[in-house]
């Protein structure tokens, strides 16, 4: 390690990615030398609207620059379509894929906002997105980072996207002929995962970095930085939680994109009516909409505190003095919640009151 430290850049596609980036930098910057080296945050607009996160990230003091990234999907370039046809022949398909990989990486050049080669460490969340093709085509080494907590356990995109002759394709990616994400590309130095032991298929580049290590020893000041970066009007929220009506008891309701909108309103009204009191006393109700929930909770549940649906639920772990008497979810897994005395998971049986089980695949909402 040089006396100047190592300069860093992070490519993020979601708020969760930015959250993990924030945690990583809080730890790295405990070393003054690394803090001086600086970090740049790149926010890709390809699949997510970050709103004014850029401004709040700039104010956090963690980044020397926060830049928007107009990352382009392959469909933006119609000339690539010819390389995506199935010829019915493995050799021809692989030759087409080689051409696709090279051409896609080149076409992205005008949309890359920084010179990646000037950074010592490049961290990419979800390198299956176009940025992975760009870096591999231009022979730039990078670190891949797990898209979500243990996400490869639930959906191994590298193997699924390349099912059929996977070993051959992995060999080709290792030699940078084609591109495969999540640790299989030549220019991917390592693939950070939370827990390698739970992953059914080993990969030599998996690097176990438990997310718990990023959260267990945060100072109060560091927690305040996290909250300030992801929650707008932080001070106003904290005052409301401390002094607002029925603040002595708190209940958090996690919404989900269930059923049609009218049924959804009824579901959450019923939940609040049944579980919104603690020991017979009305509680202060907070609602955290699911990122894909389009119901207007500000309008339909205006008497309650409606949290921004964009920020990761884990951020609530760091709000000063925030403890919930009860957290209620229908189908959402609540393992990441550390701030509740009671977690109430209502499950499939509860949903059967509102909808026949065969109508939808409910697992798709969690």
Spans of features found by a protein language model:
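Histidine-anchored nucleotide/phosphate-binding helix
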Residues: 11, 15-33, 40-41, 267-276
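A donor-sugar binding/catalytic signature common to diverse glycosyltransferases
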Residues: 21, 315-359
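Short internal beta-strands
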Residues: 36-46, 143-145, 285-290
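Conserved nucleotide-sugar phosphate-binding/catalytic loop shared by glycosyltransferases and other
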Residues: 38-86, 305, 309
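Conserved nucleotide-sugar donor-binding subdomain of glycosyltransferases
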Residues: 81-129
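A nucleotide-sugar donor-handling region in carbohydrate enzymes
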Residues: 160-249
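Catalytic donor nucleotide-activated moiety binding site of glycosyltransferases and closely related
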Residues: 280-311
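Conserved small/polar residues in nucleotide/adenosyl-binding loops
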Residues: 365-366
């Amino acid at each position: 390690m040089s006396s100047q430290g190592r300069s860093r850049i992070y490519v993020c596609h979601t708020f969760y990615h930015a959250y993990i980036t924030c945690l990583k930098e809080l730890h790295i910057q405990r070393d003054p030398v690394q803090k001086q080296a600086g970090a740049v945050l790149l926010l890709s607009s390809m699949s997510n609207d970050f709103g004014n996160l850029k401004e709040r990230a700039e104010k956090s003091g963690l980044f020397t620059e926060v830049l928007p990234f107009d990352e382009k999907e392959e469909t933006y370039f119609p000339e690539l379509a010819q390389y995506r046809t199935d010829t019915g022949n493995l050799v021809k398909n692989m030759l087409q894929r080689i051409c696709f990989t090279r051409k896609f990486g080149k076409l992205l050049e005008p949309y890359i906002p920084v010179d990646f080669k000037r950074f010592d460490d490049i961290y990419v969340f979800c390198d299956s997105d176009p940025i992975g093709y760009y870096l591999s085509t231009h022979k730039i080494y990078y670190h891949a980072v797990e898209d979500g907590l243990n996400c490869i356990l639930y959906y191994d995109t590298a193997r699924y996207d390349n099912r059929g002759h996977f070993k051959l394709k992995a060999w080709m990616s290792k030699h940078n002929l084609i591109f495969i994400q999540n640790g299989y590309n030549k220019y991917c130095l390592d693939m950070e995962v939370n827990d390698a032991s739970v992953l059914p298929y080993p990969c030599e580049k998996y690097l176990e970095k438990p997310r718990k290590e990023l959260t267990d020893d945060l100072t109060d000041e560091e927690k305040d930085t996290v909250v300030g970066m992801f929650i707008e009007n932080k001070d106003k929220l904290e005052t409301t939680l401390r002094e607002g009506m029925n603040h002595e008891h708190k209940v958090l309701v996690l919404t989900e994109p269930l059923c049609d909108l009218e049924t959804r309103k009824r579901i959450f009204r019923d939940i609040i009516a049944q579980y919104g009191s603690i020991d017979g006393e009305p509680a202060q109700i907070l609602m955290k909409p699911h990122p894909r929930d389009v119901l207007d909770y500000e309008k339909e549940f205006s008497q309650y505190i409606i949290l921004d649906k964009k920020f990761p639920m884990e951020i609530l772990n760091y709000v000063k003095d925030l403890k919930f008497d009860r957290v209620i979810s229908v189908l959402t897994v609540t393992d990441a919640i550390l701030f509740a005395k009671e977690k109430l998971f209502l499950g499939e049986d509860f949903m059967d009151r509102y909808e026949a089980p065969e109508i939808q695949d409910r697992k798709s909402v969690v």
